[in-house]
């Protein structure tokens, strides 16, 4: 019988770009513009931030996994006064550190991939991880390490469907490629059930900020679709006819550590 964790891994594998498409790509498609991870002066509240904040003691600590600029951490400072960021890119940790100075919090950073660096990462009152889980095939050790580093609560934010789903029409139009419809956020609850972790999932909506935060957002989409620069005009025309939605469906999955 296939476990929920095995299904999660196999479903994610369906999202691999076919080799023949990837091999012809002039530019690597898996780019993350730093502008996407900049945080505003005033962070809009969300259900994810609320669930993290309500478990945070005054003056407590938050550990942000795959932190980027740290929106998951700085949204709850205060009441948190100490932030810890984990990221694979030093550029993101530098951004996280600079933001800590702006928000007036003490800061620690850990360079590396989660959960490989978990043992060298401090424990915190609340652990947050925003928009990372859909990149993780080996999901059980990832979740177990989150649980082990939280004193009070773990809060995970993910889109309801795979984050690349908003480009499915583009893949069909330019490559006649049908993209998967699995996994979905609720599948993580099944994995957590298998781990004997009693978690709650709640749904809400949030903004899509790609075109607002990234100069040349259409070029970003072109690269994600493995198309060369000379086809940018076709991309621009396609996006004009099929604009990205302004809102997206999100889920927050959280549990209190026993």
Q: What residues fall within each predicted segment?
A:
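A short SAM/SAH-binding and catalytic strip from SAM-dependent methyltransferases
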Residues: 126-138
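A short acidic, Gly/Pro-enriched loop at the edge of an enzyme's catalytic core
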Residues: 119-126
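Conserved Class I S-adenosyl-L-methionine
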Residues: 200-258
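Short alpha-helix
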Residues: 181-196, 202
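Class I SAM-dependent methyltransferase SAM/SAH-binding core
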Residues: 63, 69-116
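A short glycine-rich, Lys/Arg-flanked "PGG" loop and its adjoining helix->strand segment in the class I
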Residues: 140-155
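Conserved class I S-adenosyl-L-methionine
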Residues: 1-56, 153-180
């Amino acid at each position: 019988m296939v476990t929920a964790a095995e299904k999660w891994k196999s479903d994610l594998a369906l999202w691999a770009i076919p080799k023949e498409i990837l091999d012809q790509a002039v530019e690597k498609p898996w780019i993350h513009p730093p502008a996407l991870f900049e945080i505003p002066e005033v962070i809009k509240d969300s259900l994810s931030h609320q669930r993290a904040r309500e478990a945070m003691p005054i003056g407590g600590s938050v550990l942000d996994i795959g932190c980027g600029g740290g929106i998951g951490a700085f949204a709850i400072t205060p009441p948190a006064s100490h932030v810890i960021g984990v990221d694979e890119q030093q550029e993101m940790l530098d951004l996280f550190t600079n933001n800590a100075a702006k928000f007036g919090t003490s800061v620690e950073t850990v360079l590396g991939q989660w959960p490989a660096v978990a043992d060298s990462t401090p424990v915190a009152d609340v652990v947050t991880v925003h928009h990372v889980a859909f990149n993780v095939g080996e999901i059980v050790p990832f979740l177990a390490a989150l649980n082990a580093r939280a004193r009070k609560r773990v809060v995970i934010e993910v889109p309801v469907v795979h984050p690349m789903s908003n480009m499915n029409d583009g893949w069909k139009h330019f490559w006649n490629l049908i993209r998967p419809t699995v996994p979905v956020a609720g599948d993580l609850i099944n994995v957590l059930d298998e781990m004997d972790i009693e978690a709650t999932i709640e749904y809400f909506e949030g903004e899509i900020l790609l075109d607002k935060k990234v100069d040349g957002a259409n070029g970003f989409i072109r690269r994600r679709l493995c198309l060369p620069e000379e086809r940018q005009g076709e991309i621009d025309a396609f996006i004009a006819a099929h604009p990205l939605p302004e809102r997206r469906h999100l889920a927050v999955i959280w549990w209190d550590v026993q």
